[in-house]
């Protein structure tokens, strides 16, 4: 019952968060951007090292989360801006595929390295709370746009 209450509270929070921003109904042509595999692995390692330094578990890589992180990074590249558009749908889809009770994500742009993205998240209380949250799995997508700018999506779940 407690988990169900927490899940309902999370869904309500996401709905309220989503209602604060307007989502465009325009059609966007999504072109798959190239992944920066080294940056993705480095960011995953830095986040896990940070968690371990706090006495927390290292997060396991999830190919399901990676699929959704990639799709969202492609979407952000196509829009030219970072956002959490359609997060509630992503979270619901991931939850149904892996039976997750909680899903969260961090996004970033305008960082050249994984370390810079990590530091940016660490200096934001909400992003830091997500990185340090009680999660078991994650995946990081880092994609470059045509100008070489990196867009990051990290999805967490338990």
Regions found by a protein language model. Give the residues of each.
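Bacterial N-terminal signal peptides that target proteins for export
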Residues: 1-8
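Short, surface-exposed glycine/acidic/tryptophan-bearing loops
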Residues: 70-114
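C-terminal motif of bacterial Sec signal peptides marking the signal peptidase cleavage site
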Residues: 15-19
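Solvent-exposed, polar/charged alpha-helical surfaces in well-ordered, non-transmembrane soluble domains
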Residues: 41-49, 67-74, 105, 115-120, ...
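Disulfide-stabilized extracellular recognition modules
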Residues: 108-158
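Hydrophobic helical h-region of N-terminal Sec-dependent signal peptides
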Residues: 10-14
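Surface-exposed patches in mature extracellular/periplasmic domains of secreted proteins
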Residues: 53-67, 80-91, 128-143
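A short alpha-helix/helix-coil micro-patch that ends at or immediately precedes a cysteine
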Residues: 23-77
């Amino acid at each position: 019952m407690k988990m169900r209450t927490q899940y309902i509270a999370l869904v309500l929070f996401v709905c309220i968060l989503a209602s604060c921003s307007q989502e465009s109904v325009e059609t966007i042509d999504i072109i798959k951007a190239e992944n920066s595999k080294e940056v993705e692995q480095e960011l995953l390692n830095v986040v896990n090292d940070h968690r371990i330094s706090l006495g927390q578990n290292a997060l396991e890589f999830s190919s399901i989360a990676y699929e959704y992180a990639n799709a969202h990074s492609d979407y952000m590249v196509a829009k030219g801006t970072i956002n959490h558009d359609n997060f509630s749908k992503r979270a619901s889809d991931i939850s149904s595929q892996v039976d997750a009770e909680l899903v969260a994500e961090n996004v970033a742009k305008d960082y050249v390295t994984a370390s810079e993205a990590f530091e940016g998240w660490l200096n934001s209380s909400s992003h830091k709370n997500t990185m340090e949250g009680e999660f078991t799995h994650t995946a990081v997508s880092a994609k470059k746009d045509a100008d070489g700018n990196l867009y990051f999506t990290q999805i967490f779940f338990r």
